[in-house]
Design a protein with these regions (language model features):
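Active-site neighborhood of HAD-like aspartate-dependent phosphohydrolases
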Residues: 1-50
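Conserved active-site and cofactor/substrate-binding residues in soluble primary-metabolism enzymes
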Residues: 18, 68, 155
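Metal-dependent phosphoesterase signature
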Residues: 56-92
């Protein structure tokens, strides 16, 4: 492959707003989000004091999704992906994504967004792969936390490097887009 086109981020780069919070709200409602925030108060306070966004996200995602059936959450994710595609995508970056597709570039979304909605959205957009935050699973239910940690900053680079190496594409030209230092 001559060129791999990589989207560095989803929220704010491809979309006009953050998606993690609205998705968790869709799954758990306000009661679920509130329970997730107070379920482990000492861990939440420690993470907040350290400004550890990754740990806070892990606690919140685990608090909302833990114990829920994977199929149920993925069905909500499919509907959420439809909503994002219909109303939340940025026109300018979607035009750029389509340009890369027309040029025959491989498109990989690399994001801290959650797999239950980002994978279906990736299919809808016709991208080649999605590397993102994966909620922990235990059989057919979600467990506590994120499998492999949050996909941001250095973790994005690590996952992308592994993805390229698995295809023997280490010499590919990479186009990356993002809107924050974590991208």
């Amino acid at each position: 492959i001559d060129i791999a086109e990589i989207r560095g981020e989803f929220d704010g780069t491809l979309t006009v707003r953050d998606c993690v919070g609205p998705f968790l709200l869709r799954v758990g409602g306000w009661p679920g989000l509130t329970r997730a925030m107070v379920r482990r108060p000492s861990a939440s306070l420690a993470a907040a004091a350290r400004r550890d966004r990754d740990r806070l996200k892990e606690l919140l995602v685990g608090g909302v999704l833990r114990g829920r059936q994977v199929a149920q959450v993925e069905a909500i994710g499919e509907l959420f992906a439809e909503q994002v595609e219909a109303s939340w995508l940025r026109t300018d970056t979607m035009e750029r994504l389509r340009w890369h597709q027309r040029a025959g570039h491989r498109i990989v979304l690399v994001s801290a967004s959650l797999s239950p909605y980002l994978r279906p959205l990736g299919r809808r957009l016709g991208v080649d792969d999605v590397l993102c935050a994966e909620p922990m699973r235990a059989g057919d239910h979600f467990a506590d936390g994120l499998d492999g940690g949050n996909c941001r900053a250095e973790e994005k680079v690590r996952r992308l490097d592994a993805w390229l190496a698995a295809r023997s594409w280490q010499d590919a030209t990479v186009w990356a887009y993002g809107d924050s230092a974590g991208d």
